């Protein structure tokens, strides 16, 4: 009856030393050790030790080599946050939440789930995209002639906004009223400038404004409107992206901010 014995050999030794029989567990190997398995006959082990030693099968040897390689190598786990698919093959991930739009003299990133709309609200409007499920979340681009050489010729960002306040919507009601919610008498709409900044991109000055507008009858708690503006070749370029206040804090902020800040001259 045949049995299998495994011996651990050190390359430094001229005569291999026999180790005890390993049953069911393959020992860990160092780089200067070799695992040799020999088939022996139980009935005549001493006589057959030097004569009838048989190497393990190719399949077993291959299995041992693969196992040793796996132990000796470092495998980097696929990166994946909770709820995201693992990048198993290491290919770079692309942001599918946005699509690049190249217009006449400008470009920007638009949320992939927003659809084009032909509605025109503002002078010189050349583009409008809106959320599939909520038209309040949208972006427009308007291009109008100007005699200004730079956006800074309009004054400060706040002074510029006062000259294009039609972007925020005009108050249509002109009667007597006292509305709750911090509105002045006879006013049913209010706009608060939350943030302004300037930047130079490609040698051109840009204004960036973040505005919160509220109306007395609004059911969204107001609108967050982000405006990016610049001047080039006698044209005033304005990009305005917005979302309702409630949706702003439920995920719309990411899409509106990325859209407005991605706008630039082409």
From Swiss-Prot:
Any idea which UniProt keywords this protein has?
Chloroplast, Membrane, Photosynthesis, Photosystem II, Plastid, Thylakoid, Transit peptide
Residue range of the transit peptide in the UniProt record, numbered on this chain: 1-80
Name one molecular function that GO assigns to this entry: calcium ion binding
Protein origin, superkingdom: Eukaryota
Which Cys-Cys disulfides exist here? none
Which residue spans adopt a coiled-coil conformation according to this UniProt entry?
Answer: none
GO BP terms, alphabetized: photosynthesis
A Pfam family (short name) is PsbP
Localization per Swiss-Prot or TrEMBL:
Plastid, Chloroplast thylakoid membrane
A cellular component annotation (GO) from this entry: extrinsic component of membrane
The record's comment on protein family reads: Belongs to the PsbP family.
What protein is this chain from?
Oxygen-evolving enhancer protein 2-3, chloroplastic
Native organism is: Nicotiana tabacum
């Amino acid at each position: 009856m045949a049995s299998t014995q495994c011996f651990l050999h050190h390359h430094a030794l001229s005569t291999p030393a026999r180790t005890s029989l390993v049953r069911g567990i393959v020992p860990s190997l160092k780089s200067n050790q070799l695992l040799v398995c020999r088939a022996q006959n139980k009935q005549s082990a001493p006589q057959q030790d030097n004569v009838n030693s048989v190497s393990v099968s190719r399949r077993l040897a291959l299995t041992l080599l693969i196992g040793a390689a796996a132990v000796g190598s470092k495998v980097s786990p696929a990166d994946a946050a909770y709820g995201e698919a693992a990048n198993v093959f290491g290919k770079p991930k692309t942001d599918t939440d946005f699509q690049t739009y190249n217009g006449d003299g400008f470009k920007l990133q638009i949320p992939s789930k927003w659809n084009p709309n032909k509605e025109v609200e503002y002078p010189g409007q050349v583009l409008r995209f809106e959320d599939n499920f909520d038209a309040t979340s949208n972006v427009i681009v308007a291009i109008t002639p100007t005699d200004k050489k730079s956006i800074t010729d309009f004054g400060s960002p706040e002074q510029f906004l006062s000259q294009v306040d039609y972007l925020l919507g005009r108050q249509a009601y002109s009667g007597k009223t006292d509305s709750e919610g911090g509105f002045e008498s006879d006013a049913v709409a209010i706009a608060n400038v939350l943030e302004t900044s300037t930047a130079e991109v490609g040698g051109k000055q840009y204004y960036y404004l973040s505005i919160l507008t509220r109306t007395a009858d609004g059911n969204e708690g107001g609108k967050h409107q982000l405006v990016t503006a610049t001047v080039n070749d006698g044209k005033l370029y304005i990009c305005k992206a917005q979302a309702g206040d409630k949706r702003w804090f439920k995920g719309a902020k990411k899409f509106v901010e990325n859209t407005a800040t991605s706008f630039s001259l082409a």
